[in-house]
């Protein structure tokens, strides 16, 4: 869809991980299927979100757990109607959309440009490693040229475990610069 995601024309200033987690955490979700779970993040307020293809591959029942801010607290809500909009097995990406006419507008995150990242830049991930939702891990970019199975990857020292797959890797400007995976 047109206007599916936003890219900041002028990058915002860098901030602390603590500030950014408070700002961005609501846009990160847990993706559940009968055979497992992963992470994801909203691109738009209307419920379009990204996860990894391998998280939802072959699944027909996909539930998205979202954490809404309510009176200074985070409230978990499961959305049972998630439609697959697009999938790319080679890129290991899937675009989903929550189909719930009563859903509120969702917090979403901007995409950044991973080409401007440099080795040594600080990055962090938010996800659900081992099912532990809303876990934050931090590290640095180790290399931008890691090739595996015909694909180019960003490699980071940020701790990534099963369940992080599909979640965002952020720079310190609060922009998504990668989608965590390593199946």
Q: Model features per residue range: what roles?
A:
Residues 1-22, 27:
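N-terminal targeting leaders that route proteins to membranes or the secretory/organellar pathways
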Residues 27, 33-37, 44-127, 131-134, ...:
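Conserved active-site neighborhood of the chymotrypsin/trypsin-like protease fold
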Residues 31-34, 158-162:
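Short loop/turn motifs at secondary-structure junctions and domain boundaries
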Residues 41-42, 160-180:
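Catalytic nucleophile loop of clan PA
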Residues 44, 84-86, 143, 171, ...:
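A residue-level detector for short acidic-glycine micro-motifs
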Residues 52-57, 127, 137, 162, ...:
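Short beta->alpha transition motifs characteristic of CBS
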Residues 89, 128, 146, 167, ...:
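Short, conserved catalytic or interaction motifs in soluble domains
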Residues 136-147:
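Short, compositionally biased
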